[in-house]
């Protein structure tokens, strides 16, 4: 928290320079020394005020004899009492108004031959009555009246400002549109290339599948021919499965083993009688 002076009518804060062009120093109230504290408060004009340990007085309220210097550092003497206080409160509002207000210089006196500044022409709808007052030698005021015809308003040029932003927008959108079109064409070419690769892979898969079925069919036919040459005892049963007009699958099975009848006939076990 920055330090500031608690004395009335004083607004010194930490970092300011004092009357001796040195930084203003701050000192706490002697709360533990009752008589000295009362002397401080009497000189300040605040006898009934009780300061806290966080409030200070700046060095501008002490005389040079209240300080002692050691190694270039200014210390407050133990018996020092502040005695420099301003009794009259400064008029802050007046100082602010004086600082904010600028001095107004009186207007220069008008000369007789000084031409009056011309004001911009104001279009009117009818004749204007102009009254000119000026000092003359005969009478104090002379009145001259004349009729003025209103000036025709100057033709204003057609506004072409809204067209300029539209043209600028069109010229700015041209490169962006061209870049987007090129990107679309590039993506279309990539898609066509991927589709061609996919179709080639599908044809290759179909070809490999057909070749594998033909190889199996050939092996089955070979086994069939070998079984026919070996004889009926070593013959095998074959199952031919047609998967297409040019594809056939032959499955070979071992010959069925001889089976025993599950219900054998009952033998005649009767013993002949004697």
Curated annotation (Swiss-Prot):
This is THAP domain-containing protein 8. One of its GO terms (molecular function) is zinc ion binding. PANTHER family: AGAP005574-PA, THAP DOMAIN-CONTAINING PROTEIN 8. The keyword Metal-binding applies. It comes from Homo sapiens. It comes from the Eukaryota. The keyword DNA-binding applies. Keywords: DNA-binding, Metal-binding, Zinc, Zinc-finger. A zinc finger (THAP-type) spans 1-85. Pfam families: THAP (PF05485). Residues 83-121 are annotated as: Disordered.
């Amino acid at each position: 928290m920055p330090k500031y002076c608690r004395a009335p009518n004083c607004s010194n804060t930490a970092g300011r320079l004092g009357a001796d062009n040195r930084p203003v120093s701050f000192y706490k109230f002697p709360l533990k020394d009752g008589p000295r504290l009362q002397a401080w408060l009497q000189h300040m004009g605040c006898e009934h005020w009780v300061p806290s340990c966080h409030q200070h007085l700046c060095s501008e309220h002490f005389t040079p004899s209240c300080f002692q210097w050691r190694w270039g550092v200014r210390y407050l003497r133990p018996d020092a009492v502040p005695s420099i206080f301003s009794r009259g409160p400064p008029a802050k509002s007046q100082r602010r108004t004086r600082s904010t207000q600028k001095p107004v210089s009186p207007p220069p006196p008008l000369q007789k031959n000084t031409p009056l500044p011309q004001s911009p022409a104001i279009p009117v709808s009818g004749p204007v009555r102009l009254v000119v007052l000026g000092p003359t030698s005969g009478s104090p005021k002379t009145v001259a009246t004349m009729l003025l015809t209103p000036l025709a308003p100057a033709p204003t040029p057609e506004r072409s400002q809204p067209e300029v932003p539209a043209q600028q927008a069109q010229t700015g959108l041209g490169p962006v549109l061209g870049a987007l079109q090129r990107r679309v064409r590039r993506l279309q070419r990539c898609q066509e290339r991927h589709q061609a690769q996919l179709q080639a892979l599908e044809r290759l898969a179909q070809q490999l599948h057909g070749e594998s079925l033909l190889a199996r069919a050939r092996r089955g036919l070979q086994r069939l021919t070998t079984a026919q040459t070996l004889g009926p005892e070593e013959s095998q049963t074959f199952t031919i499965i047609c998967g297409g007009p040019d594809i056939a699958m032959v499955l070979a099975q071992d010959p069925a083993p001889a089976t025993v009848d599950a219900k054998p006939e009952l033998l005649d076990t009767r013993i002949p009688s004697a």
